[in-house]
Amino acid sequence: MDQIAVATFEKDIKFEGFLLARTSDQRTSSNGSKYLDMTLCDRTGDINAKMWDGTVTPPPVGAVVKVRAQITEYNGRLQMKINKIREAQEGEYDLSFLVPCAPYPAEEMYAELTQAVAEMRNETLQKIVGEMLRMAGERLMYYPAAQRLHHAERSGLLHHTSSMLRLARAVLTVYPWLDQDLLFAGVIVHDLSKIAEMKSDEAGNVTDYTVDGLLLGHLVRGVTQVREAARRMEIPEDEEYVLLLEHMVISHHGEAEYGSPRPPMFPEAEMLHWIDLVDARMNEMNGILRRTPAGAFSEKIWSLDRRVYHPHYAGEQDAPSPAPAAQEAPRRPRPDADKAYQGLL
């Protein structure tokens, strides 16, 4: 589609084109008037959008809309002021331009996980992790890792998990005394229960959280899924590695403030927490840099509680680069294709 990418929006430009509605609500202002408040996106990024006409019905979440708008700025952050909006008709747009996607094929990322399971020598962990991947099923191929924060993209859960797995391989070259099977198992299963926590369509757009997700959350549900997988594989629930894996799931947020009722209590659990945090924050920062010009600070990012600076990197253009999903994704070696790559990572 021939239209301006969200990642390259600048203040005062006019925009007419197609975008995907990630959130869509009718709200009431302090003076009692109604307005539309939406998050609209293409595959390069998203932007908050307002339409000050309270008579317009909010488009369904996940719908493609055609808008005519102007890019404004509010509290140092770009915002879209919509003048006209309508739902798009099939055939008017190219969905591949609108859906944020992981930069690598889902099948390739999934192969990295199954390769790690095949490498395991611990039969208990191998059986449990393999069964949990089977329990996740086809939804794992398209599910995002979050609704709005890190890896909020089609196949984002696989992107997050496979990136963490490569980071874990690198960590093991520095700390070879860690239990590789236990660390790999924790990485692969730690967020699988997000599939039960969120409602996502096949485009990777999360419309809401499930009742299960709101009442229990993915940490608690993850523990029950580890135990269920062990039961299915006829592994006693008092087997120590079952308990260790349950602890890794419930402690991977690190602190009670962030949802973990127990802090990590053994080295592999501690390492899982930091690998998870590093990968999530690097993904967020990468997205922030793509929409922030070199030499400028971003708006305050509430999830990081700070602004982020985009340095003048050598050889980089001043304008924000398009998101990786908008380019041809760099090809990574497959898990079984490059032993030198595996040795380094």
Report the location of each language-model feature.
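OB-fold single-stranded nucleic acid-binding module
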Residues: 23-34, 46-50, 54-96
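Divalent metal-dependent catalytic cores for phosphoryl transfer on phosphate-bearing substrates
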Residues: 149-150, 159, 170-294
